Amino acid sequence: VIRYGIVGVGGFAANWVRWLEGLEAAGQARLAAAVVRDPAKHAAEVERLAARGCRVYPTLAAMLADGGVDVVGVPTGIAQHVPLAAQAMEAGYNVLVEKPVAATIQEVRELQEVARRTGRWCAVGFQFIYSPTIQWLRERLASGQLGALLRARVAIGWPRGARYYARNPWAGQLRQGDTWVLDGPATNATAHHLENMLYLVATQGGGAIASVRAELYRAGPIASYDSSCIEVLTEGGARLLHVASHTLEETLEPVMEVECERGSIHWEAADNSAIVRYADGREERRADPDPDEVHARPLAQVARVAAGLDPAPLCGLGEAEPHVLAIDLAFESSGGIATIGPEHVAQGTAGDGSALVRVEGMEGLLRQALASGRMFSELGAPWARATRPVAARGYGRFPGNEALARALGGV
């Protein structure tokens, strides 16, 4: 049984603890060690884990020095992903890091260099990539039966209120200390659904990003953005559109529509199900046999890699890099974040009961974007502003110019 050592047991890391305990019951992996920087804060959980045979350490360095783990997990805040993953890889460990791997393309490439130098690998926890449904869709596209992927689009409306933004020091922020986090719906909460499209289009010749055009907006009292439209054009000519917002009261679960030369794909996140329709009238359906297990699948597949049963993580740094590049170029294209004026905003309530900033008409805009493939400015939203595409070729460092650095509050 593969032994995990993870950094943290509170916040989002508490989910990893639960998922690993489920995998332990199934005989696939177990939580052998955990880093808990503030054991007094998590006293009950530390006691419970110790009773289960999990060793608890005050620092990652102490856990790495003691050994006894096969994979190091990093379910921490965005700013800590790269330094902690690099520390573990330098010590000889393979790593699974939570998504996104980083906020900037230079950090991803630094970590890729660590992987090359150490011979270790770093998997990234984009959960749907590890699911049988997305893998099945990737196989269908790679087979050529659908022809070239022409267009893909996804729209997501996930209400997020004051409690969401108060849950940690970097939620809704551009930076944590001196490190960029660029938090926002496309960067973090709905990142999976941008990554899914980038992962699927990578089966095509010319699947690399050619340019990005984006509109980033802020309605709430945060530093970063809470609504976004991101258009990605690939070198092969495919157009991908990701539209998302936290500024609404009605939940719109992710739906992805894909148009190909010889058919189409309809995918829904709620039950991780897909329908493939071919131009000749054939239809195939795939439902996830256990959609509730989607969150634990990265941990399970990485354990199989560590055990020598699978050749490589389904989502490594190479697969996760395009998402980070798309986010960085989105900020470059938008030139910062546009504020939605108070005349278009109202107060609402999130599902957790906390106060929420609501943009009037956002639900309808998201539905229109999914149906038409148009961006907020193209749909005539009164607060929206059009932007220009930015080329990906040669881009290697965020922010790419001083004007953007100033717009985001410093270099």
Question: PLM features: residue spans?
Answer:
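Short loop/edge segments at beta-strand edges and connector loops
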Residues: 58, 97, 124, 213-216, ...
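Predominantly a Rossmann-like dinucleotide-binding segment in NAD(P)-dependent oxidoreductases
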Residues: 128-212, 218-221
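Short acidic low-complexity segments
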Residues: 55-65
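Contiguous beta-strand/loop segments that form the cofactor/metal-binding neighborhood of enzyme cores
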Residues: 182, 188-313, 324-332, 341-411
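N-terminal Rossmann-like dinucleotide-binding module
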Residues: 1-51, 405-407
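Short, Asp-centered acidic motifs that coordinate Mg2+ and/or phosphate
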Residues: 33, 71, 151
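Beta-strand-loop-alpha-helix segment that lines the small-molecule cofactor/substrate pocket
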Residues: 66, 71, 77-78, 82-129, ...
